[in-house]
């Protein structure tokens, strides 16, 4: 089973301690977003988890726990979004310069095949025009 953690809520950035507790306890419960009464228990034991995909804009809060994930036998990689959007659109993400530094640290530790850079979503507004994206993308 592949655990997608999580495109909806950025678990590494905001819920790292919760995720590590779930892995230690070996399970989590998931509520069906279309039927709130349907709750499923998912085993998170390493023998049942083929890989964990961490979707994040800020992996730094999870990084202190990576040795523990390794020692427990979890296989994982990061889909790492770096955008550099203006604060009006993305107030909770670290600055692009900081995330680029974190990306380098994570790639050094895990290897380039386990840290995938993403530039999305691409949003067009009066502030983030096509020209903004061309200029913003270059230094990243």
Where are these regions (language model features)?
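Generic, well-ordered alpha-helical segments
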Residues: 44, 95-98
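Generic detection of long, well-ordered alpha-helical segments
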Residues: 9-16, 96, 130, 134
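Alpha-helical context
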Residues: 79-82, 93, 116, 120
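A short acidic (Asp/Glu
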Residues: 63-66, 89-92, 125-133
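Conserved C-terminal portion of the radical SAM core fold
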Residues: 98-140
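Conserved Radical SAM active-site core
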Residues: 1-89, 105, 110
